[in-house]
Amino acid sequence: MTNFRLNVLAYSVMLGLTASVAYAEPTNQPTNQPTNQPTNQPTNQPTNQPTNQPTNQPTNQPTNQPTNQNSNASEQLEQINVSGSTENTDTKAPPKIAETVKTAKKLEKEQAQDVKDLVRYETGITVVEAGRFGNSGFAVRGVEENRVAVQIDGLHQAETISSQGFKELFEGYGNFNNTRNSAEIETLKQVTIRKGADSLKSGSGALGGSVSLDTKDARDYLLNKNYYASYKRGYNTADNQNLNTLTLGGRYKYFDAIAVLTSRKGHELENFGYKNYNDKIQGKTREKADPYRRTQDSALLKIGFQPTENHRFSVVADLYKQTSKGHDFSYTLKPNTQYMTYDEKELRHTNDKVERKNIAFVYENFTETPFWDTLKITYSHQKITTSARTDDYCDGNDKCALAGNPLGMKYNQDNQLVGKDGKSAKYQDINKTQVIKERLPFTKPNGRWRFHKVDWDALKKKYPGVPIYASCLEEDNDPSEFCTYEVKTTKKENTFEINGKRYDLLSEADKNVISDEQRLPTNVSYLFSCDGLNCDKKTILGFKKRRNLLKIFLFEVIEKRCQKYGKTKVKANDQLSGPYLFMPNKKGYQANLWSQRDLTSETKQINLDLTKHLELGKTQHDLSYGGLWSEMEKSMTNLAGDTPLNVKWWAQYPHNCATFLPPSTMTPNAKPTLNPERTSTLCNNVNVFSFLIPVKTKTGALYFINDFRVNNYVAFNLGYRYDRVKYEPEYIPGKTPKIPDDMVTNLYIKTPEFDASKADSDPDELSKKEANAAANIKEIAQPKKFSASSYSFGTTLDPLNWLRLQAKYSKGFRAPTSDEIYFTFKHPDFSIQPNRDLQPETAKTKELSLTVHNDMGYITTSVFDTRYQNFIDLSYQGRRDVHGHSKLIPFHFYQNVNRPNAKVTGFEIASQISLGNITKLFNGFSLSYKYTYQKGRINGNIPMNAIQPRTAVYGVSYVHPDDKYGLDLYISHASAKNAEDTYNMFYKEEGKTDSTIKWRSKSYTTIDLLGYIKPIKNLTLRAGVYNLTNRKYITWDSARSIRPFGTSNMINQDTGLGINRFYAPERNYRMSVQFEF
């Protein structure tokens, strides 16, 4: 039914266009038809305008030219004004093949607030969902994340650690913020979305497409005045987000500047039914979205200096910081506390951050020379850090386990244990003897002696385990008919009395109050803070094991880290026979197990971009050429530790936190011994390590593009780019964060040999192990070079005034990331070995489009075919023995390899119709329609999960002739994701025979209504209703973010409990108010 509706609309629009051409008033040259004018004339003529200009090419539009500048420069100024502060594309003009341009005005009209909103009303491109970390790049034509290039002002943004082995080992556990960074929408002047191979513009990574983000410039606002000011205040109910953005621009003589300051504060995105779900449920079956507090702060600063009309200097600072703090209630690992119940339990706290800083210096030259018309040199220094901080602790203070003191235990001035009432505590551990007289009747009258007449077996059954000796207290001549026997029983009494109440320490019920862990044997020494003891007395009163008597323990006072401690002396030879000390609980603090994982990408880049217009005979040529050089350092730093919180007076401090203790002086040739206290939480241990070898990437590139028109009917686009990439690992032992030894030992180099069983306790064996690890890392970390050629060939044919044919053939590539080459891990169940022989991935796109257009609008249909080669994927390499490990445990090895091929095909429809051209009654009204269908397979039969199901977006828009108000209605439809188009790569490990994904998205339709009004010149009010019909639905990107294993983004795969957490929000609203001067 959906396809039928789509086809009816498509053909109806096409017939309407054709009819409007046939019955239009005759004219020799419609305003948007080919003319004999040069190709650099007004932009609404259907020329083959450059489709692959680099995003950082010169913008030869100075704003502070002297008043006597020539008319050509004035035209250029007018053009830049159009591209910045208003729409830069004629919505009636036919689009370029596989390209969508969105201006700041378009984004404002769509009320976009993040990158997901950039593509909300687009088809064929979506945003990758990453659970608690938000979004991670885009998915286009079957590929995603690093295979879709993302640039901001010509700079590549941070890539994820794309090694599939790394993802399987770490990504499912919520410890790494392994996502691609985003951008602040309010700072963007223009967004260009290109589908298909696109390395000509973006270099490595543009296999499925690219998204180029260009930031605002003062010249966008200061054409007809010397200042600009704007303030916007907004609110979104879906995530309770508050928006504040201030834009200031000004010009004085030769200087101009702009500042865009934006702040967003909100919470988690509220899923459908958010207010109805139980907030207390923890684990993977939780249906309510996990709570987070999110902030995003951005500052874009640009200062320009233009002393003459041909020379311009600029300084740029683009600062962006995004934070998210909250709780992972859906985290699947929870502690199990035996016998004890507490008001508060351990909880995972999250603190994630993405920070980007870019400082750039730009020089632009507008002097026309034989070699260029414009020249632009840009130096950029960008640093991007993605961080994930997790803290696992109980934040209920004294309500938490091991921190409470419900009995109010403390030591008084005499160092005697007392309770809340101030009275001394009492302890008793004795065996209490009891004598019971049993009167046993004669049951055997024929017995010779008195004790022969008694059934002693019955008495033994009554007192099992008690010795019974056949004898009677009465004499044999006693006339009585019974036998009296004294049974001696022993009952163990183990009690603790405090606050006037006695607790039975043998009772399971009382273990909730007094547990075995609260009794400290004195066969070892303890170190207590003098905050809880009277250290001036230097004695402490404890309890003997079997009698309710006090025992004096001597201790010495020592001072460490400016704090005094009392160190008790050993008072017993073994744990069972010695006396006891009682404490409120064992630890006396809350342990915070924390980790912070930072991924850093730091780039230094120089761009040289030139343009030149040539007329050769009757042909018009627009040349773009130049190059770049960049140096990018990518590294990982992992910090992990164990920190005490809410430390109490009874906490047992370690005597020594060193890893090894000095050798004994009593034993000849003794070696240092491993310190058992080295792992104590009170040592505040911090480990610094990394799973990745730091790598410096050097990239050089040259490109040349020629857009030329042969005549009014034929135009071509030719481009070529050469990239050279070199990886230089920079692992320096002792300085670089350490790679864990066990990940690499004996992988390639077998010497020096060491005894793995003694390496953790013997310093000599540990040194050998570290030397072995260093040798293997050196063997792995060898430089690697890649080179790649990218090209594009396009043609545009305009055989008729209303018909356009476009064809494009392009090639893109993606060099293997450093982690795909060098990542190493060693474990019997899952070992990964590096692969220095990986080849670049390549993509070749063939696309053909047909466009019918006139003044009324256009409808474009296109078909495409993209072939991917050398796809990098994880492959099982088999089992083998590893030197230094038991041969009984073979290691399972995996490795990144190049897969042969993948293929994606599909077709798209895009249309934009202005109804005012049909009748004046519909002036201001327009219709739009977009549709995408695509299908893809890897190696011929494996579905590509990144492909979206069929999607369509219908649009109805109205804009007042004087732009005083406007309305937009969007109807978005997505078909169900079919099972045969999904692939679960873990189905064999899960013991399944079906390789499809069980939980998928169903068909859904949503309606959004957006509008704005300008009651006065300087004021704009905007509002929007999203999911107007309150439809419950889940997108395919959200559904496929559910992980089959791990601790994060999990649901119950059998019942589906927890999947509601991934559903889109209910009906929600956005509103904003903006003042402009």
Swiss-Prot record:
Instruction: Please tell me which stretches of this chain the record labels as motif TonB C-terminal box.
Output: 1060-1077
Chain intervals for the UniProt region annotation (11 X 4 AA tandem repeats of P-T-N-Q): 26-69
Residue ranges of domain TBDR plug in the record = 89-216
* UniProt keyword terms in alphabetical order: Cell outer membrane, Membrane, Receptor, Repeat, Signal, TonB box, Transmembrane, Transmembrane beta strand, Transport
List, as start-end ranges, the regions of compositional bias called Low complexity: 26-70
Keyword Lipid metabolism carried by entry? no
Source organism's superkingdom?
Answer: Bacteria
**Extent of motif TonB box:** 78-85
| Record bears the keyword Transmembrane | yes
Q: Which GO terms describe its molecular function?
A: siderophore uptake transmembrane transporter activity
Q: How does it sit in the membrane?
A: Multi-pass membrane protein
What is any Pfam family matched here?
PT
Q: What is its main location?
A: membrane
Report each sequence repeat as a residue range. 26-29, 30-33, 34-37, 38-41, 42-45, 46-49, 50-53, 54-57, 58-61, 62-65, 66-69
> Can you give the residue ranges of the TBDR beta-barrel domain?
224-1077
Region Disordered, as annotated, extends over 25-72
Q: Where in the cell is it found?
A: Cell outer membrane
Q: Which GO terms describe its cellular component?
A: cell outer membrane
Q: What role does it play?
A: Acts as a receptor for hemoglobin or the hemoglobin/haptoglobin complex of the human host and is required for heme uptake.
Q: What else is known?
A: This protein is subject to phase-variable expression associated with alteration in the length of the CCAA repeat region. This mechanism is called slipped-strand mispairing. Addition or loss of CCAA repeat units would change the reading frame and result in introduction of stop codons downstream of the repeat region. This may be a mechanism of regulation and a way to avoid the immunological response of the host.
Protein name per the record: Hemoglobin and hemoglobin-haptoglobin-binding protein A
| Annotated source species | Haemophilus influenzae
